[in-house]
Amino acid sequence: KSSILVLKMKKVLFVLFFFTLLSSNSSAEFTFVQTKNVALDTPGIRGINFKPDGTRMYITNRYDDQKAYMIEYSLSKPFDISTATISFTGGKPKGTALACDGAGGDDHMELPHAIEFKPDGTRVFVTTNKDFSGNPGVAVFQFRLSTPWDSTTLVCEKIYEVDVTDSGKNPPDEDQVRTLAFKPDGTRMFVGGKAEHKIRQYDLATPFDLRSGVTPGGISGALSSADNNMRNIQFNPDGTQLFIAGNQNTRMNKYNLSTAYDITTLSSSFTTFDLGSRTNNMMGFIFASNFTKLFVTSDDGNNDDSGNDNQIHEYEI
């Protein structure tokens, strides 16, 4: 009994220590571990996510400049990207095509970005900034996975066009939707883009389902002073902090929310963490392993021999 009590106390102390670190202003919370180059697998890495147990990793891939694919990796050691092996064994392009009837004349999704899964792995959501229908056409694609966490079994269920109209801006519409996050219970979705530098929230009548009952629920103020080229967003576990990063610089910014998971209460001030020059061309990021690890994707877009193309960077917290 005493040993069990000691273990429980250690877990409590670890959690308290971790949240104390993230609440501080120091930039030393993120320790670089390693980089994995996936240029042989993808010419255009974007979003990244993991299965909760760390045994699978997923990235979105832009092939032939725009066409969208999802590439899945198996990890022999959870959350250790050096052990990641691509699951796809065919030719090029690698990965599972992201396609959906109704996306204009071509049903193949284009310009993919962030990836978010339903917690049980039976649904996956991907943002796109492809204007396939106009006015403005940026959207979140919803896919069902007939086998949980197996991206080769995905089937499109819905293209949810994001309402990004802003009458106070000229031009009035967001031109790129890149970021994506959900409230843990699936009743609220958050998206952000490039042109307006704002984050929008939507209430979902059915958790993790965009097919009906989606209601706009508020919008943040403009974040252009610090986050004017967002690539992804992620909340801390209790929804009182929001992390934002993009490819305008090498920083990650942390904002507070006075009401959990309510983007309209996002603070105007923020804390900055510098991730180093390796993230100069950030394309996406994800916290994983109970918020003890951070993974960042980057691509300089040159497709040359510089070594800066299509990389995944691992950090410990």
What do these predicted ranges mean?
Residues 63-67, 130-135, 195-198, 248-251, ...:
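Short glycine/acidic-enriched loop and turn motifs that connect beta-strands
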Residues 72-84, 143-153, 201-212, 255-265, ...:
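Short loop/turn segments immediately following beta-strands, especially the blade-tip
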Residues 34-41, 85-107, 155-172, 214-226, ...:
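Surface-exposed loop and turn segments in beta-propeller and other repeat-based domains
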Residues 50-53, 119-120, 184-185, 237-238, ...:
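Residue-level detector of Asp-centered blade-edge/turn motifs that repeat once per structural unit
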Residues 60, 127-129, 192, 245, ...:
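Residue-level marker for isolated small/hydroxyl-bearing positions within beta-strands
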Residues 12-22:
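Sec-dependent N-terminal signal peptides
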